[in-house]
């Protein structure tokens, strides 16, 4: 794909990478895989030639996704795993994730890719889930989403037992599947700033609106996990992961910039997270 993008012959491509024609031929025929050193050289070469490797990865995933035929009641999603899925799917992520322990899937392949780019044994999956057969809730992209994330990340424990706390505990109780906005690399920085008191709820809500986030589907029960089908596994090369790391870093930098802009625009509007909790503790917020 890289060679075709540059309209080079195998000989020309080999010369650029300082390898033999036979080596390039073996790579392209699938008889050998470039080692890390060769892929690192390719990374520098692709950067120099402005080759959109990350976009090529997304295109490959899109083509594989389009080839999958699903029953009408199933939704196509993406999942990134740090070490691959072995055995049955279970709701066993870290407890303090956005929506608690569960099997996390999303509508945005880019989000799943940037989450696993640092892990050598990571695997990327195209999956599907049947929503209609599950007890599920879809949380709108508003303050309820942020507070539900706060609850599941353990940020609301100081008001445990209040009606406000119980509202969010009950919201996802006895559910198989939770659907809500995804805290991508940019939004992650904004919501963390909300929790530590650097931005108000108004700033957060406007960020949710401005970023047009994808959705995450989280199977939080075994029944929910049993409804998930793995449709395809997509191999990721070391070269592709290097480009994913770069994209993740760019997204985080944009998140910092966005949070700073929002801080300026909504400095005096809305309430800070601690103020919301204090009001809930005193019985003012239900």
Residue ranges, per PLM feature:
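A short, Lys/Arg-rich alpha-helix, primarily the initiator
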Residues: 1-5, 43
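Short alpha-helical DNA-recognition segment
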Residues: 7-25
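DNA major-groove recognition helix of helix-turn-helix/homeodomain DNA-binding modules
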Residues: 35-55
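ADP-ribosyltransferase catalytic core
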Residues: 74, 91-101, 107-169
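Active-site and NAD+-binding cores of ADP-ribose-processing enzymes
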Residues: 132-286
């Amino acid at each position: 794909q890289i060679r075709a993008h540059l309209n080079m012959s195998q000989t020309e491509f080999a010369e650029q990478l300082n390898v033999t024609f036979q080596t390039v031929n073996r790579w392209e025929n699938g008889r050998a895989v470039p080692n890390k050193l060769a892929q690192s050289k390719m990374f520098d070469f692709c950067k120099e030639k402005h080759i959109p490797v990350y976009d090529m990865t997304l295109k490959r995933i899109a083509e594989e996704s389009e080839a999958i035929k699903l029953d009408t009641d199933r939704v196509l999603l993406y999942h990134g795993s740090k070490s691959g899925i072995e055995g049955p799917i279970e709701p066993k992520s870290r407890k303090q994730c956005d929506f608690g322990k569960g099997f996390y899937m999303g509508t945005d392949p880019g989000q799943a890719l940037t989450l696993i780019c640092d892990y050598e044994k990571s695997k990327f999956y195209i999956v599907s889930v049947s929503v209609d057969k599950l007890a599920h809730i879809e949380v709108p992209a508003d303050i309820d989403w942020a507070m539900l994330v706060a609850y599941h990340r353990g940020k609301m424990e100081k008001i445990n037992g209040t009606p406000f706390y119980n509202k969010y505990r009950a919201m996802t109780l006895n559910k198989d599947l939770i659907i809500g906005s995804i805290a991508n690399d940019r939004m992650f920085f904004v919501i963390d700033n909300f929790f530590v008191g650097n931005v108000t709820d108004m700033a957060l809500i406007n960020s949710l609106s401005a970023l047009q986030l994808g959705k995450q589907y989280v199977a939080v029960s075994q029944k929910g996990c049993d409804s998930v089908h793995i449709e395809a596994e997509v191999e990721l090369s070391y070269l592709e992961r290097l480009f994913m790391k770069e994209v993740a870093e760019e997204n985080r930098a944009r998140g910092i910039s966005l949070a700073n802009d929002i801080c300026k625009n909504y400095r005096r509007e809305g309430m800070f997270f601690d103020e919301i909790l204090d009001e809930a503790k005193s019985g003012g917020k239900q």
